[in-house]
Amino acid sequence: METRSADKLGPFVVLTFIYFIVGFLTTVNGQCQGPLKVAFLADAGALKNTFVTLISFFFFLGYLICSPFGGRWINRVGYKRTLLRSLGFMIAGLAMFWASSWFTVTFPAAVVGIGAAHVPGGYFIFLTGSFLMGTAAALSQVVINPYISAYELPGTQSVQRMNIVCAINSFGTMIAPFFVTTLIFGGRAIEEVEVRQLMAPFLILAVFVVITTLTTMRMYIPDLSNTRAAEGERLERSIWSFRHFTLGVVAIFFYVGAEVAVGSNINLHALEMGGNGEALSFFGRKRLMIGELDLGIPAMLATIYWGGMMVGRMISSTMNRISPRIQLTTVTLAAIVLMAVAVGSNNLWLIALLGFFQSVMWSCIFTLSVQGLEKYTAKASGIFMMGVFGGAVFPVLQGIAADLFGTWRWTWLIVIFCELVILFYALIGSRVRNSKESPGKRRPEI
């Protein structure tokens, strides 16, 4: 029995570790916005906020374009080979990050004029890398989400496994901001960062992912044939005919939009406040110094946000008697109240606490969306991940609004709107209307 449990645990650990990498690199991508606004976009004029949020836009564009391929590849070649392809895209994306720095340093005169803005050519290479990284993250999650949800690990239920994996993912997102400020940009004040500092860290990360890929190739990851159509099998129904799934895609679109808007743009709001003479302090300290390293107040905000997600997911992983619908309703109501108070008081520390309440939204929405889909699950996962494109849309909308209004403060109302849509899904949209919603024998609602 112990041997069988150990065999069962192996694939779970491998996929959880890769999910950690996905979370870590997703946040590294987003946290580069603040420093690269200084290093790349000093001459971008009044469009700085719009241009810098394109980093998140191109990352999540990868989800919209490439997620459906993940579901098809799972049906065609299985979970493991699709996962290996995602790691290949990840290596390519990290290589492009390195190339963007090298190109800018080597060819400083290669500048693109867009209206009154002047943007280094290397910045567009970085955006290409962001797209490839988003593609890698999308394909990885298309594999990991349905696999972990359906994988039978003794003593656990689906939403628990999802929350455990998401908690480890959140640990990666929590430590990433300090990786950006201390290891990539050397702990310098944000006004002093240089493009050349990107080269070595991203090259090291690429080598690390290569090693992870080679290790995964040698690991045994059993296929879960009951979660995907057999090769050549035609599915009788359109995946969009499942109402609770379709509305789940809409809900995840708004959820990821809210999550990424906070995680990526809260540091930009902090920089704006500092420039207006309203610099934030952490227990009375304007700068977080360890020796000569400046950890940065903006990085602390992001760390509290992503750390709150990790803590919330760890707590939720023990709640095996509370249904996903009740969990989602409760945390969404709390998130709406918190954001309303934060916007009214212009308090970024309260916005950073939103991560705790958003922590279980992903796993609850996914679990409710794929309930009873059976052989449609793999295809559903690919379509579901298209909804993550919300992470591209809402941060950019927020950046445009900040440029138009001259402040980030009231742009957080966008996040409150997103939370209201999620609340609708929790209360109404996630309910399976009748037995025709399920391709097989109807299961009790969760």
Q: What do the predicted segments below correspond to?
A:
Residues 10-41, 141-145, 262-270:
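Extracytoplasmic
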Residues 29-33, 181, 239-303:
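Extracytoplasmic gate region of multi-pass secondary transporters
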Residues 53-72, 303-315:
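Central cavity-lining transmembrane alpha-helices of secondary-active solute carriers
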Residues 83, 126, 328-329:
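Primarily marks hydrophobic transmembrane alpha-helices of the MFS/SLC 12-helix fold
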Residues 88-119, 333-345:
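C-terminal ends and interior cores of transmembrane alpha-helices
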Residues 139-153, 359-375:
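Intracellular juxtamembrane helix-capping segments at the cytosolic ends
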Residues 157-185, 382-395:
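Glycine-rich segments within core transmembrane alpha-helices of 12-TM secondary carriers
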Residues 176, 180-189, 203-229, 425-430:
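C-terminal membrane-cytosol helix-exit motif in multi-pass small-molecule transporters
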